[in-house]
């Protein structure tokens, strides 16, 4: 009897992706984040769908529709907080996934890496627009400040901003289009994620050593299905703990005040997962310079394959590079902390130094360390 799993046109795709996929036998838990991101995306799409059934994208009713969801809809508060904290979990998994890629040299798979960077941009855009929807103070002012950055573009800036706003300020038109885009983008992300996976399966997974593992592959199922299930259970545990015990831990209290264009909050800041980029933006006194640095802080990921000077793929056997990598992680966390602080004396200079170190590490120090390591190994 011919196995339907291997012959049926649809089952064959599923089989080659999740069942009979040849996988390196030594991939660690850092390889769990890909499947966790898939889980986060599905959770966000489902909770978002149920929220959209009760939400009204109108400046007069948006805020009260969220209150209605939390008070009057059956388990509406659970859905709302799962969605809000699900975004935080999404970004934790994203940053861990990117960090894993940087450490183990996964960026050598160019197509997979570049689609991953596009995915990162798309997820960031989606999260930003989602934050605007509750129409609280931070939603409104966050939207105003971030969209206003585009006015730094010479010649077309102001026109571009007004085109995005759909008027002369962030208003009803802006909220409606942000809702429409926030609804459609996750499906685009899903499509991109499938392409991301498609390109990955062209080459096969990397592994901690960075050495080709074609001679030592095992089937994905049952080994990695069970491993991914454990990861998924841990993710769900953390998400539920956060949602049920501290739903507002990562939010901003200002967003419980309805949006008021006449009153600016004392400290305008985005959600925690954008703070590192916000700190880089604020550390440059010039508007256009700040916007360029902000863009480059993410776009720099596209240049990482070009900056790979080592003869080894992974950092597993490269102590200097490891040291600089963890310095980069510490710098990322420092920038995240500084982005949430007010613009005053110690934080300003710390932010500028941390921003400088961020670019210096990626563009200069890490490639140089790799060259030194090559020399030491007489390669």
Curated annotation (Swiss-Prot):
Heme b b562 binds at residues 83, 182. Its main location: mitochondrion. It is a multi-pass membrane protein. PROSITE patterns: CYTB_CTER, CYTB_NTER. Binds 2 heme b groups non-covalently. SUPFAM superfamilies: a domain/subunit of cytochrome bc1 complex (Ubiquinol-cytochrome c reductase), Transmembrane di-heme cytochromes. GO terms for cellular component: mitochondrial inner membrane; respiratory chain complex III. Component of the ubiquinol-cytochrome c reductase complex (complex III or cytochrome b-c1 complex) that is part of the mitochondrial respiratory chain. The b-c1 complex mediates electron transfer from ubiquinol to cytochrome c. Contributes to the generation of a proton gradient across the mitochondrial membrane that is then used for ATP synthesis. This is Cytochrome b. It comes from Hyperoodon ampullatus (Northern bottlenose whale).
């Amino acid at each position: 009897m011919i196995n339907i799993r291997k012959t049926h046109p649809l089952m064959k795709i599923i089989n080659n992706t999740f069942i009979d996929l040849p996988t390196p036998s030594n991939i660690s838990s850092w390889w769990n984040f890909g499947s966790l991101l898939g889980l986060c995306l599905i959770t966000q799409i489902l909770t978002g769908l149920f929220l959209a059934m009760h939400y009204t994208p109108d400046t007069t009713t948006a805020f009260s529709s969220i209150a209605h969801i939390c008070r009057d809809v059956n388990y509406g508060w659970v859905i709302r907080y799962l969605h809000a904290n699900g975004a935080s979990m999404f970004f934790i998994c994203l940053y861990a996934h990117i960090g894993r890629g940087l450490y183990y040299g996964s960026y050598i798979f160019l197509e997979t890496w570049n689609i991953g960077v596009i995915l990162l941009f798309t997820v960031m855009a989606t999260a930003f627009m989602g934050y605007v929807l509750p129409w609280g103070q931070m939603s409104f002012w966050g939207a105003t400040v971030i969209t206003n950055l585009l006015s730094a573009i010479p010649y077309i800036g102001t026109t571009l901003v007004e085109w995005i706003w759909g008027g002369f300020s962030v208003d009803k038109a802006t909220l409606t289009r942000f809702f429409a885009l926030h609804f459609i983008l996750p499906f685009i992300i899903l499509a991109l994620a499938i392409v991301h996976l498609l390109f990955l399966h062209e080459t096969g997974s990397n592994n901690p050593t960075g050495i080709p593992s074609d001679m030592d592959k095992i089937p994905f199922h049952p080994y990695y299905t069970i491993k991914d299930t454990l990861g998924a259970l841990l993710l769900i545990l953390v998400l539920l703990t956060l949602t049920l015990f501290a739903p507002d831990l990562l939010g901003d209290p200002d967003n419980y005040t309805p949006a008021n264009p006449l009153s600016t909050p004392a400290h305008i800041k985005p959600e925690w997962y954008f703070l590192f980029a916000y700190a880089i933006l604020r550390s440059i006194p010039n508007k256009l310079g700040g916007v360029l640095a902000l863009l480059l802080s993410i776009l720099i990921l596209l240049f990482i394959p070009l900056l790979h000077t080592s003869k080894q793929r992974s950092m597993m056997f490269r102590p200097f590079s490891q040291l600089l990598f963890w310095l980069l992680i510490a710098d990322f966390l420092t920038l995240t902390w500084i982005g949430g602080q007010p613009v005053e004396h110690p934080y300003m200079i710390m932010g500028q130094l941390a921003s400088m170190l961020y670019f210096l590490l990626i563009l200069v120090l890490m490639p140089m360390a790799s060259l030194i390591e090559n020399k030491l190994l007489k390669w």
